[in-house]
Amino acid sequence: MAEITNPRRVLIVLGGLDRGGAQSVVMNYYHFMDRTKIQFDFISHSNKKDELEDEIVSLGGRVFHFPRFKVYNLIEYRRQWIDFLKNHHDYLAIHAHMSSTASIFIPIAHKYGIKTIAHAHTSHDMGNIIKRSLEKISFHFVDYMADCFFACSQEAGIFRFGHSVVEGPKFGIWYNAIDLSLYKFSAIKREQIRTKLNVKNDELLIGNVGRLSYPKNQSFLIQVFYSFLKTRPGSKLLLVGNGEMELEIKALVEKLGLGKDVIFTGSVNNVQDYLSAMDLFVFPSYWEGLPVSVIEAQMAGLYCIVSSNVTREVRIGPNIEFDDLNRGIDFWVNRIANAPMYPREKMNIQNENYDIKEAAQKAEKFYLSLLS
């Protein structure tokens, strides 16, 4: 392996740089890698300054803004990649966390000798049938183009790349690792956050962390909570995150008369404190790759009631159950009502795959191996 005198730069490609799932995973690794050896730059497909931009710059990274790909702007989009890599062709690798356009920029990267990595974060596609069809065609080409393939779970890998790639030598699991020590339950933080939210000690606080969007299915959770509240008045529902369905979800809360019972925090940078404040974590997603928030909730000692659509690979301890959304609202109300409550202070869940300190070192070694 060549001796390193300056950090080698890896170009991270994402849809945007808000605090979403894929972005959180990337930033966790970024913080814990040795940035004297590996440094990240970012492509963001947004026309505004991103939420994470200042943080990235403070860590030594650079952010470049590209137009969002719309099919009709294919020539313009491809030209921007050609011009960009013509002037920035010293990257060790391009790590595509937004693989829908990877078939466009991977051949350009190879022209300049840049290694390419395709990374899957989900086990389902969104969008209309035309968009999904175009993405499938794009992914088909990526399967033959990329030098390496990663996914957050086996299920996401098979969905995005197919069995032949997942069972081949170029594929690996890139765990959605976190700082385990950060998510350990804190009685002090619990009291602080509950005081801030005006939640009393004897009130049950049900929590959910995730983008306010269709896949996360918070609308179903609100309807479940509405029915649950009839059996246990005084309970509260805490929704941490923002997203494109925020207004619609808030309208549902008002329609059901839950304005004083459902708490919206928006995006926060101290999720771990809010997890300590919760009593129970409920996650009724329609689909996921491997949700970081469920890993975090388990590490915080919360009992988790999770949709059966979520891969079982997310289980890192015994305090989680997987339930079918088709069982309906009453079934989920019953599961919440019968969820076990236990002391969280002495819980000590350890899982080396999800320990960011270990995972970041492995990622660093992988990137550096591309030098040989």
Model-derived regions: residue spans:
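N-terminal strand-loop element at the rim of the active site
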Residues: A2-R8, I12-G20, S24-R79, K170, ...
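A conserved mid-protein helix/loop that constitutes part of the nucleotide-sugar donor-binding site
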Residues: Q23-N28, L204, N208-S227, E244-K250
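Short His-centered aromatic/hydrophobic patch
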Residues: A96-I104, A120
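A short, active-site helix/loop in glycosyltransferases that binds the activated sugar's phosphate group
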Residues: M145-F185
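A short helix/loop element that forms part of the nucleotide-sugar donor recognition site in Leloir-type
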Residues: K184-V199
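Aromatic "clamp/platform" in nucleotide-sugar-dependent glycosyltransferases that forms part
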Residues: S267, Y286
